[in-house]
Amino acid sequence: MTNKKADVGIFGGSGFYSFMEDIEEVSIKTPYGEPSDNLFLGKIGSATVAFLPRHGRKHSIPPHKINYRANLWAMKELGITRIISPCAVGSLQKEITPGDFVVSDQYVDRTRGRIDTFYDGPIATHVSAADPYCPELRELAIRATEESKVKCHKTGTIVVIQGPRFSTKSESKWFTLMGWSTINMTQYPEAHLARELEMCVVNIALATDYDCGLVGDVLPVSHNEVMLVFQKNLDKLRNVLFKLITVIPKERAKCKCNEILKHARFT
């Protein structure tokens, strides 16, 4: 337990919290083990924000080894009800160009073996994932991209692969033919676990490259190339996040995210 409190939680890459003020580092223990790192608390406008580098501050934890439950529970310990989950993605569609933003409204889980629920019994709990992202936060995020004057796609399906390897060309072509928008390694189970805890969650994806199967002469992607594009657009993403955080209302009046378990349990 901790006596620290925050309004909004952000998962992201190391150094992402540098735009916050009055930063304090906090260690939180959870029933599910250690989070990826300590959390960094700071101010953005009037909001207290908690930041957690999902891969650890030295990017030492691969996506399939992240303790997603501990990360989300640490946010819950701070009293957080809103989660912003930005990430780098590969584009699966030509109209989504490197540097574009996508406010995802759906995901497809192609991971395997990840622990993806808090509810292993004794009460059967079946949380709906029909609309996995908070409609109110999505609306506010889209508005923030518009005010920041960045190119944004207002909907998109993000396919989440196991990692740490990138896709084969055949896999990538299949994802494109399915009509999915982007590809990533961390959105699942991160987004779903937030939902199980009745948190509002929004994904803001930044396209860093075209995935390998989209165009015939695209060279295989490398992690270094992804990070170069991500760093180039980091200021834009920070600006979007700042605008979003400053307009999130205190009360959750326009969504039902806080009532998810009411319709999920058999007693």
Describe every region a protein language model picked out.
Residues 76-79, 176, 195:
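Non-catalytic positions within long, well-ordered alpha-helices that form the structural scaffold/packing
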Residues 185-223:
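Zn-dependent metallopeptidase/amidohydrolase metal-coordination segment
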